[in-house]
Amino acid sequence: MAPSEFKTTGSLITALFERYKANMQQIATGILKDVNEADDVVQDAMVKIIKNIHMVDDIDSRRCANFVYTIVKNTALDVFRKKQEEMEQLVTNDVSDFVNIIGEEIDFDVFESDYGFSEEMQEYLSQLKEMDKDIICLRYGNDFSDEEISTLLGIGPDAVRKRLSRARTHLAEI
């Protein structure tokens, strides 16, 4: 549904939330492994989405879904990293205990991107840094502009262009 089909921005936001809330929750829970923290992440992500609601063209489009899922994923990863930093400060001597406290690894499989890339390309993309992968996917999978990507990821347009250039170079080397 296009934004023009909604009478108010509030009804657009409500429809968008209803459409994606289950997947948003699943992504956040998959990364954080805590339902309460995931709820907070979904709320924080919705605030970011609301601030950028002008970027939503059709709530049922793949572009909108990837926009929403990328914000949720990045917000959850920010919380995870912050939590990890706090835990690192608590641990002073025993590194092996630290590994047991934070767990083995994050389950990124819950964030299945549907950018239209072949399996071979997805394999190459998996070798990139997370931010570079997001930039490549948003640029070539969704046709986002540098400005849209910079707004979404919270970095400058020049940084987007530089990261995109480096990511393409890295992909060419693979």
Task: Outline where the language-model segments fall.
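Arg/Lys-rich amphipathic alpha helix in sigma70-family domain 2
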Residues: 70-91
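DNA-recognition helix of helix-turn-helix
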Residues: 124, 141, 147-174
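Internal acidic/polar
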Residues: 86-114
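Short helix-coil-helix linker/hinge
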Residues: 115, 119, 125-133
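C-terminal flanking helix
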Residues: 21, 25, 46, 129, ...
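Structural recognition of an alpha-helix C-terminal capping motif at a helix-to-coil junction
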Residues: 26, 40-47, 51, 62-74
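A short, charge-rich alpha-helical start-of-domain segment used by transcription regulators
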Residues: 3-30, 36, 50
